[in-house]
Amino acid sequence: MIFSQGASPLKGDFSRIKFSIASPESILAHSRGEVLKPETINYRTFKPERDGLMCEKIFGPTKDWECYCGKYKRVRYKGIICDRCGVEVTTKSVRRERMGHISLAVPVVHTWFFRSVPSKIGALLDLSTKELERIIYYEVYVVINPGEPGEKQGIKKLDRLTEEQYFQIITEYEDNQDLDDTDSAKFVAKMGGEAIHMLLKSIDLNETAVTLRKVLRESSSEQKRADALKRLKVVESFRKSYEPQKKTRKKPGGLFPEDEIPEPYVYEGNKPEYMVMEVVPVIPPELRPLVPLEGGRFATSDLNDLYRRVIIRNNRLKKLIDIRAPEVILRNEKRMLQEAVDALFDNSRKANAVKTGESNRPLKSLSDALKGKQGRFRQNLLGKRVDYSGRSVIVVGPELKLHECGLPKSMAIELFQPFVIRRLVERGIAKSVKSAKKLIDKKDPIVWDVLEKVIDGRPVLLNRAPTLHRLGIQAFQPVLIEGKAIQIHPLVCTAFNADFDGDQMAVHVPLSQEAQLEASLLMLSSHNLILPQSGKPVTVPSQDMVLGMYYLTKSRSGEEGEGRIFYDSEDVLIAYNEQRVGLHAQIFVCFNGLVDQKFDPLRVLETVIDEKSEKYGWLRSQLEQKKMLLTTVGRVIFNQHVPESIGFINRVIDKKVAKELIGRLSSEVGNVETAKFLDNIKEVGFHYAMKGGLSVGLSDAIVPETKVRHIKSAQKDSTKVVKEYNRGTLTDNERYNQIVDVWQKTSNIVAEESYQKLKKDRDGFNPLYMMLDSGARGSREQVRQLTGMRGLIARPQKSMSGQPGEIIENPIISNLKEGLTVLEYFISTHGARKGLSDTSLKTADAGYLTRRLHDVAQDVIVTIDDCGTTRGLHVYRNIEEETSGQIKFREKIRGRVAARDIYDTLNNNVVVKAGEIITDELADLVQDTAGVEEAEIRSVLTCESKVGICSKCYGTNLSVHKLVEIGEAVGVIAAQSIGEPGTQLTLRTFHQGGTAQGGISETETKAFNEGVLEFEDVKTVEHSSINEDGVEDLRTIVIQKNGKINIVDPESGKVLKRYVIPHGAHLHCRPGNAVKKDQVLFSSEPNSTQIIAETPGSVRFADIEKGVTYKEEVDPQTGFAQHTIINWRSKLRANETREPRIMIIDASGEIRKTYPVPIKSNLYVEDGQKVLPGDIIAKVPRNLDRVGGDITAGLPKVTELFEARIPSDPAIVSEIDGYVSFGSQRRSSKEIKVKNDFGEEKIYYVQVGKHVLANEGDEVKAGDPMTDGAVSPQDILRIQGPNAVQQYLVNEIQKVYQINAGVEINDKHLEVIVRQMLQKVRVEEPGDTELLPGDLIDRSAFIEANENIAEKVRVTDKGDAPARIQDGQLCKMRDIAKLNRELRKNSKKLVVIEPTLQATSHPVLLGITSAALQTESVISAASFQETTKVLTDAAVAGKIDNLLGLKENVIVGKLIPAGTGLKRYRTIRLTGDTQKQAAVAEAVAAPDKEIEGHGI
């Protein structure tokens, strides 16, 4: 494949790259000579052999400016070709560019085009790969021209003949062979590459395309149409590769451009016969080097061996042809040549790959050099090694400013050496470069002074691998230090995810002025305080700093100086320095500004000052008038560093408060002030952490005395569960789940009590509690293990299916302070090892997810300001989500542009105008305005920009709180924002020691807040039963599915919280009841779905037979028989149907209700038993995912969603709104019908035994699942459309990150990725466009194809029109109108036309891997996966890569089209002249118009 013309590829400026199949002429045009010998170098002289694979005559000299024989040496002979050895005198670097060629004795088929799936050659010739293989490898003859003998024998073109058949025809029609080869009467049949070459040459692409399109239109056979379509795709690819090229020729004797005569357009493109090679290109020798080792041996590239095989076999074949060897020997040699060339191009695809002699590994062919992680694309083009860089271990630099890093002198002098040398020579300290180097080597003191001046104002870039997001590389101002380790500021550790246990970092020096400027303005660490993924601060104090600030701002009663009154903060500091007042003393300070406090000072006043005191009344009035402040000395010290505009922070500063404060500072006072504040609180934090002398001792871990009581109670409860199981009222699964629940609850109670115990210890100054409460280190989970009980341990299993046995049901009762027994220690090792193994295994999964995300979104760049769309995304206030800790309404709209006015429905006021950016203040206002239930916001999901996206649809750049700028690479930011937490969280697993978390299946649901109850669709029955103590137990049981309870504000009527009540729940309240917070509303059985009787009557079993549809399991411990429905489908005889169901029959024998019983159900009634409403008939066990707590469980789920995979057992979803009814039953499936009021009916077939959620007569909406199982995203797209599936994917992925990991990712990042998944449409009917049915194309390309034919019409009868007009032709309407006017004038027959048919399509949801491979850019797709396939398809179609994305520009070595690399910035010129400025402005504005429509 030739990428560009000219002797040196890819030099100079180019804007796009075309891929095509190299013709023999283009290979020869690039070649500098033919390689005739297989030798590489002479083993005696070590010089390249003439005409060999390393020949200097062909590829250029091995030494700069010196020919092979040594006649010409030195640069003055540049360009001369030596008359003795024929070598051109030039630089040795040409050996990286100059190519050679091998002329083959016979044509050879290129393996890529023959072995690719589907085979390109096979599609053109309509031959299967197997048949092609037999022809290519000289096993059978193929008929090229049947001629007269063929007609007589009934042989057609492309028929395969054996050797006997071929010779029989040749001998029978001997005279026929004397005819000329061009004579159509001559019988021609050949084998091998030559035959394929002749066949491909004879193909008429236009005629083939017409024939195939006819088959597509007219054939009724599906198979024929599918085959025709497959072939047509390849034919159309070849036809598309033809592009008109303007050619000119010179006048005879003309020399100048004006003497050129334009010729008619010449069509140049891929010809099918180019897939068969007559000439093989030989790549430059420096790209397949031969390196001498010690001991006279050589290391060589595998390609040299592969080329040698080709040359040896080719030369042998030429000799055999010359001596007219027998056909059998020739044929064998030709086959071997074909195999040698196959191995050269793609050795890995063959079963019998060519292997090396010593290590017996397959040789790396040209294809292997391109693909995979070690291939050319990923190893050398996307990831290069960088000069002016170094790496070293990092240590903390607590005295550094936020924008500084400590750079070891020895490292700095190496990195900045050229600059130091220049400065030394300029200042006359050294006479020459050589003497300057000597000064540096001697480490002369003056060198350090010069180095200081050189690095002043020159930032360096620090990078820590793995670079998971853009904050993994930041710029710092270097400070020279002694030692060998790099020092970094403690606050940037979070961004780099660095710690000081031996981590290393790399330093890079930006060289050019522009690079230094960008590093200082964009990448300086003090400008990167906000995380792009969520808009939250990243430079948040941690560990010692937090502990110091927490200790400083905490109050303690009884401290010296408590209750004193101070005039201002200066007085407080003087008193503290004089030791008249304690650090934690509660004091009063006169203050009149803004105060941020969360407590009521009037309540606290009584604890500080005695009510009877004379000061009490005055202080109270001062506090009420807000002229006085009740605070602590420590808080006064802390507030010395807080900017005045923020006010006085009168709170205990823990990590959360610090994070909020830094976020506020960043948006209100800017980065400069925030950076100062951060440096100050770093000093304060470290200082007071040291002053407090906070460390943990064994006595600080306090075990609560109540622990023993709780454990005894839990043991009693679990014994009770076992008794119930023994009585047979519980299944083994339920017993397991309930025991796990008992211990989970107990563990949590003990944890809470031990936490409270720590809190009360030493007035809250217990060091362990302080570390925990401040957020400095540790979690409640770890305190539970230290002072409570270790609790339940997860059994390490890769599957997260929730099968019983995921959690070991015997808990570890001891805690780490008391110490574990041997058995407990042994059980613990499970979890600890799981953590360690997960870390290594799952990191790779997360890294691969990041790579796929990156590849799919890398070309999403903000290209225009506003796409002008009128569509937006509807965001609703969801009460259920907001109270369960999911993303709030304000977070969803923050930083977006309103698509329409947002109204307060209670008073009809406009809260936010359309087109306005929803700032933090506006988002808070919307959240707090009760009347705003929904908002329509601009979103990238609805952006209509043709290339990239527009800044209005994206909204604000989260890291700078401003509308995103044109040129921002938002796709890459999105991929990093999603990938980084995935990787981080897998690494965090092992800190928990593998204890089971989450998992409590809450059986009681309590009211979240006060209010009045309102019921929606709640249908209940009253049920009475006798409990264990013989007392009647009356219960209200819910029998309706998806009923809801709302808690309503009695004054405004606004719904405060909504609960969905599970089927079978016990209600503890009534509609209209007033409820208090934490009052129990209902309780439910979490471990199973219950089938409940809704009417009284007798039970009758249908199709429930022992040993056929259910099995009886007698529990060995209890002797109780449990009846479980089994998978009975395999036991059915032919045409036999069964469906286990339980019917309820009234006294008259009429069936009142039928309940289908799914597989795995446990039966709770006997045949003929009497039941009452509310009785449990059967239970279907539910799988609970109990091992939560880290994203490891969630990562496969995220991958499944991003890959848009269909779940293994998907739910059947209704396609229309309507009512459910059940139809007839076949052998193993039954019908579910949904019929609407308009008579439309849809029928679904459900496997018998699958749990059906809908009942007879239930109303369902389009998109509602009717059976259990996960809903397939493909179904949502098909039924509810693209908007619904986009929302579904974004919400589901957010759930995994939010619930499993508590990670905040802004919706807009997920939207960018989901947008890329829905970019393509599949053509259904091509109409009159040039598209093909089944084509997968960009939505914008589809719209364009339809627009192109919108103004055209189809000619149905050409009438008396000229010959250029044909029936069936598409012409412009105005041209036909003009022609008809002419025809009418001349009284001729008019042209009859009809309107063109538009193409139709449907949207397609692609997984991120498929979407990345379907990208418009060939280079980007090839560097991602399936390199050879992508390049083969691109070459056949003559695809053009317009270099619009980032990846393809990095690969070809150009500036990326993002940020300052945008086209519009490349034309900027700097000038001081105002007239020139106006001219420049005009020139720059002109190309901008073009940019408007096309993005970049």
Swiss-Prot record:
<dbReference type="InterPro" id="IPR044893">
    <property type="entry name" value="RNA_pol_Rpb1_clamp_domain"/>
</dbReference>
<dbReference type="GO" id="GO:0000287">
    <property type="term" value="F:magnesium ion binding"/>
</dbReference>
<dbReference type="InterPro" id="IPR007080">
    <property type="entry name" value="RNA_pol_Rpb1_1"/>
</dbReference>
<feature type="binding site">
    <location>
        <position position="867"/>
    </location>
    <ligand>
        <name>Zn(2+) 2</name>
    </ligand>
</feature>
<feature type="binding site">
    <location>
        <position position="85"/>
    </location>
    <ligand>
        <name>Zn(2+) 1</name>
    </ligand>
</feature>
<dbReference type="GO" id="GO:0003899">
    <property type="term" value="F:DNA-directed RNA polymerase activity"/>
</dbReference>
<dbReference type="Pfam" id="PF00623">
    <property type="entry name" value="RNA_pol_Rpb1_2"/>
</dbReference>
<feature type="binding site">
    <location>
        <position position="503"/>
    </location>
    <ligand>
        <name>Mg(2+)</name>
    </ligand>
</feature>
<feature type="binding site">
    <location>
        <position position="950"/>
    </location>
    <ligand>
        <name>Zn(2+) 2</name>
    </ligand>
</feature>
<comment type="subunit">
    <text>The RNAP catalytic core consists of 2 alpha, 1 beta, 1 beta' and 1 omega subunit. When a sigma factor is associated with the core the holoenzyme is formed, which can initiate transcription.</text>
</comment>
<dbReference type="GO" id="GO:0003677">
    <property type="term" value="F:DNA binding"/>
</dbReference>
<keyword id="KW-0460">Magnesium</keyword>
<protein>
    <recommendedName>
        <fullName>DNA-directed RNA polymerase subunit beta'</fullName>
        <ecNumber>2.7.7.6</ecNumber>
    </recommendedName>
</protein>
<keyword id="KW-0240">DNA-directed RNA polymerase</keyword>
<dbReference type="GO" id="GO:0008270">
    <property type="term" value="F:zinc ion binding"/>
</dbReference>
<dbReference type="Pfam" id="PF04997">
    <property type="entry name" value="RNA_pol_Rpb1_1"/>
</dbReference>
<dbReference type="InterPro" id="IPR045867">
    <property type="entry name" value="DNA-dir_RpoC_beta_prime"/>
</dbReference>
<dbReference type="InterPro" id="IPR038120">
    <property type="entry name" value="Rpb1_funnel_sf"/>
</dbReference>
<comment type="function">
    <text>DNA-dependent RNA polymerase catalyzes the transcription of DNA into RNA using the four ribonucleoside triphosphates as substrates.</text>
</comment>
<dbReference type="InterPro" id="IPR007083">
    <property type="entry name" value="RNA_pol_Rpb1_4"/>
</dbReference>
<dbReference type="InterPro" id="IPR012754">
    <property type="entry name" value="DNA-dir_RpoC_beta_prime_bact"/>
</dbReference>
<feature type="binding site">
    <location>
        <position position="82"/>
    </location>
    <ligand>
        <name>Zn(2+) 1</name>
    </ligand>
</feature>
<dbReference type="Pfam" id="PF04998">
    <property type="entry name" value="RNA_pol_Rpb1_5"/>
</dbReference>
<dbReference type="InterPro" id="IPR000722">
    <property type="entry name" value="RNA_pol_asu"/>
</dbReference>
<keyword id="KW-0862">Zinc</keyword>
<keyword id="KW-0479">Metal-binding</keyword>
<comment type="similarity">
    <text>Belongs to the RNA polymerase beta' chain family.</text>
</comment>
<feature type="binding site">
    <location>
        <position position="67"/>
    </location>
    <ligand>
        <name>Zn(2+) 1</name>
    </ligand>
</feature>
<keyword id="KW-0808">Transferase</keyword>
<feature type="binding site">
    <location>
        <position position="499"/>
    </location>
    <ligand>
        <name>Mg(2+)</name>
    </ligand>
</feature>
<dbReference type="InterPro" id="IPR007066">
    <property type="entry name" value="RNA_pol_Rpb1_3"/>
</dbReference>
<keyword id="KW-0804">Transcription</keyword>
<dbReference type="Pfam" id="PF05000">
    <property type="entry name" value="RNA_pol_Rpb1_4"/>
</dbReference>
<dbReference type="GO" id="GO:0006351">
    <property type="term" value="P:DNA-templated transcription"/>
</dbReference>
<feature type="binding site">
    <location>
        <position position="501"/>
    </location>
    <ligand>
        <name>Mg(2+)</name>
    </ligand>
</feature>
<feature type="binding site">
    <location>
        <position position="69"/>
    </location>
    <ligand>
        <name>Zn(2+) 1</name>
    </ligand>
</feature>
<dbReference type="InterPro" id="IPR042102">
    <property type="entry name" value="RNA_pol_Rpb1_3_sf"/>
</dbReference>
<dbReference type="Pfam" id="PF04983">
    <property type="entry name" value="RNA_pol_Rpb1_3"/>
</dbReference>
<dbReference type="InterPro" id="IPR007081">
    <property type="entry name" value="RNA_pol_Rpb1_5"/>
</dbReference>
<feature type="binding site">
    <location>
        <position position="943"/>
    </location>
    <ligand>
        <name>Zn(2+) 2</name>
    </ligand>
</feature>
<dbReference type="InterPro" id="IPR006592">
    <property type="entry name" value="RNA_pol_N"/>
</dbReference>
<dbReference type="GO" id="GO:0000428">
    <property type="term" value="C:DNA-directed RNA polymerase complex"/>
</dbReference>
